[in-house]
């Protein structure tokens, strides 16, 4: 916030500077999208942040969840937020047995949320309460006996709380092999490159990388470690060489 105190400052900054300031926070695509959105607002929207769901969702990096949250909490639009916590609560409360990774179920839960939020006077407060309830009460391992809604909860009455919600598809863990080459010259200087592969590290600086689909054993290794990201297992090797 000190580096980019307002949207004008952010929009005129270099993307590399934004990524540098974001360093260590993870989810670097969010920084890239934030920068692109700031330019869109300044250049095409006269510097005015959109105030409706319809306009918000057009911005880079803003999907249904974020557009619903902003439009309801900031601008009192009646758009239900459905995150993982809300999804868990509403599927249990309504006894929805369909897999939550299907679009049909997601739309069904969204429709339930819409019917509920339309009955309120404060859509922002409603959405925040729903998210808090799922995060603190209707957790993955809930204390249903202490829940004020258990007597009306379909899953609780049918003794299927632990079975809901469920996903039909299980992501297969993909293995990736990263072999970084660290070159050091007599002046203790090294070489870095900008990552051009479009993944979560897109446009970030890195040591020269050789990515393979198999484990490489015949390179001099300094250190190695594994990193689990989403459904990926990344095996990383750091290989250092002196150059003259």
Please annotate each region the language model reported:
Residues 1-143, 149-160:
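Catalytic cores of DNA base-excision repair glycosylases
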Residues 135-244:
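Intrinsically disordered, low-complexity, charged terminal extensions of DNA damage-control enzymes
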């Amino acid at each position: 916030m000190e580096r980019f105190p307002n949207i004008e400052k952010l929009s005129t900054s270099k993307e590399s500077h934004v990524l540098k300031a974001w360093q260590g926070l993870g989810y670097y695509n969010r920084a890239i999208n934030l920068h692109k959105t700031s330019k869109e607002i300044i250049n095409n929207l006269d510097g005015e942040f959109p105030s409706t769901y319809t306009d918000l969702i057009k911005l880079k990096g803003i999907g249904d969840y974020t557009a619903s949250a902003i439009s309801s909490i900031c601008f009192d639009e009646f758009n239900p937020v459905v995150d993982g916590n809300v999804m868990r609560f509403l599927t249990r409360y309504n006894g929805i047995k369909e897999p939550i990774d299907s679009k049909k179920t997601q739309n069904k839960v969204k429709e339930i949320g819409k019917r509920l939020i339309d009955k309120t006077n404060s859509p922002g407060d409603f959405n925040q309460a729903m998210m808090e309830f799922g995060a603190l009460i209707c957790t993955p391992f809930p204390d249903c006996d202490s829940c004020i809604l258990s007597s009306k909860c379909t899953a609780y009455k049918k003794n299927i709380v632990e079975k809901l919600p469920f996903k039909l598809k299980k992501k297969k863990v993909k293995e990736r092999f990263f072999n970084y080459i660290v070159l050091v010259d007599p002046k203790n200087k090294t070489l870095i490159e900008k990552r051009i592969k479009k993944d979560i590290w897109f446009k970030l600086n890195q040591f020269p990388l050789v990515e393979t689909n198999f484990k490489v054993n015949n390179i001099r290794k300094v250190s190695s470690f594994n990193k689990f990201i989403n459904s990926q297992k990344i095996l990383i090797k750091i290989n250092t060489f002196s150059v003259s």
